[in-house]
């Protein structure tokens, strides 16, 4: 199956960098969306601490629901160690509001990557999947 990510020169890639993350496509020259095959992502990011997912899942999305989509997802370190960063667009107007509130997105990411920096932050767009 296909895997959708953002290029290394994208707005979100810059926010990852600003939040102290080492994005697996940081050297990619594209500024928009990138479509990759599973094997490419697995080879480059299977040991990543975090994995960002944005979808419109009906109901409550979970690790089990993700594994049902593709059992290979459970092989990723971010899956095994509960490092999935999640936004459900059914509950959050991600694409409508996020571009105008980069400081909130950055705070969400900082809260996830470095919880000691913003311990009282209430996530708006991204939170850790439960």
What function would you assign to each model-found segment?
Residues 114-130:
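Extracellular/periplasmic juxtamembrane helices and adjacent flexible linkers that interface
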């Amino acid at each position: 199956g296909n895997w959708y990510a953002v290029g290394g020169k994208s707005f979100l890639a810059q926010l990852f960098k600003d939040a102290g993350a080492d994005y697996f496509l940081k050297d990619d020259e594209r500024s928009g969306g990138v479509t990759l095959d599973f094997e490419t992502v697995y080879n480059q990011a299977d040991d990543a601490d975090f994995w960002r997912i944005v979808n419109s899942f009906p109901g409550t999305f979970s690790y089990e629901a993700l594994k049902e989509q593709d059992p290979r997802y459970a092989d990723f370190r971010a899956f095994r160690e509960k490092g999935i960063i999640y936004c459900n667009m059914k509950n959050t107007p991600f694409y409508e509001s996020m571009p105008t509130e980069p400081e909130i997105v950055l705070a969400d990411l900082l809260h996830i990557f470095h919880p000691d920096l913003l311990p009282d932050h209430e996530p708006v767009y991204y939170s850790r999947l439960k």
